[in-house]
Amino acid sequence: MARIAVIGAGMGAMAAAARLAVAGHRVAVYERNGTYGGAVRRFERAGFGFDTGPGLLHLPAVYRDLFVKTGREPLESVLELSQVDPAARHVFADGTAVSLPNASRAGVLAALDGVLGAGAGERWSDFLGRAREAWDRTRRPLLEEPLWPDWQVLGRDPYPALPKRGLFGRRRPAADGTLAEVARRELKDPRLTALLESCAVAYGFDPRTAPASAAILPYMEQTFGSWYPRGGIRALADALYERCLARKVEFTFGAEVTRIIEADGRAAGVELRDGSCAEADTVVAGIAPDLLTALLKGTEPWGADDVRPAADERRRVPGRFTVALALRGPRPADAAHRTVVHAADPAAELAAVFGAGPGTLCDRPTVTVLRPDDPESRPDDDHEAVTLSAAVAPYGDLARSPATAGSGAPAVSADPRSGAHEAAVEETAALAAAADRLIEAAGAAIPGLRERVLWRAVLPPAEGESVPGPALAGAGGGFLRPANRTRIPGLYAVGGWTHPGGGLAHAGMSGALVAGLIVNGDDWRGSQ
């Protein structure tokens, strides 16, 4: 039985911890904050509850597998999980609105044809067909297997090019391009373009620079569906934490790791802020790469021939500016769980989120409106909890500085499950103006919204704490994530900053891959 120290209690780290404990190892998790779940947090006040991280679960099979492999109780025995239908309602800049059914390609085709005009659904369906080819080519290497040693082969974009007719009638393939170029070339409708590009932005990608293979993101959502657990996504983190406890994983909260101990050329434990040390045979780090390098006192965890993160990578990942609304009046029975109100000027929004400007919000941003029909989100049926969010630059007036973010972190309590897991901040003029813009835009989804607001809470992102999106093939490997196995024996990396990237499903797979490497050896190539 090996001793394993896990740094951080995010979803990927807990997934690895549970699997390693079932394999017979003694696992101890050290988390600097007062609770678990990483980006999966919840804001609670006066009987209202709001998810402040991911609002929906895609690819639930990842967590079903995790719970089956770590115990006799399946996921649905500890979590009330249901499909969201429609998957989303989209309100476009011209006022057109369409509801897209969940996990039904034929239903989506019919809905788009019915609202956007004949041919729109077929163009979208054809696009998803090509996205499926990219998914089939990369599903195993970018989700189910450790990063290949010859990762360079993934630098070629797997999205199939449309054949183009060249000179003398000969057909030639279109050049590889960005997701934005795919939208312009294949979708031929600004509303379909908004549908595609807003999905990419929601995952943290700029469609103007993301490879065409980012097409797998809407394919994944529309193929495997959108799911919601009663109690919000935080309930999934709660269930995973409970599973870890049931498998004898030890958690220490308020425990900041300041150094990874090395002995005889391998990781041998961790040192905490209070000066205490915990010896270990293996260390699993669920933190950003630059923080991992700092814990190694400057030693690089990956070599020159490996996929390596950019030095300023955490300043490149956009955050989510969130406004929690407590509303008077019941939730209408026909209200969509998720509505996306699209930006009036998509180019201005992309410049505001991904440009080199001051990091402010554009005049009318794309706003995601979450209205779960969940009794656990509201004090009674005469009220409603609504969450608004928009992508913002990872710096500027709408992002909390690390110092401010730290001061808002929950205190360590006897039970990390108790109380709210996210803290609102005092509204500055910039935050108040941004919140007003989100509420104004959301009026397209909720008529009479302003008159129903009982109170609101503003939850800006913490600078440098957003997690990147899933790993993507193409662009010469520029969208891959560092490998889970580092160059230091006994040290592994888990979570959204490493292979296979960010997102709930990918975090769960990251935990599975790390556990597989530790249990089966570094030559393990994934479950067959």
For each feature predicted by the language model, list its residue ranges:
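N-terminal glycine-rich phosphate/pyrophosphate-binding loop and immediately adjacent elements
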Residues: 2-143
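A conserved FAD-binding loop/helix module that cradles the flavin
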Residues: 54, 496-519
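Rossmann-like flavin
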Residues: 94-97, 102-210
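A glycine-rich dinucleotide-binding beta-alpha-beta segment and adjacent secondary-structure elements
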Residues: 189-203, 364-368, 440-500
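C-terminal segments that line or cap access tunnels to active or ligand-binding sites in enzymes
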Residues: 327-464
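Mid-domain catalytic core of redox enzymes
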Residues: 258-380
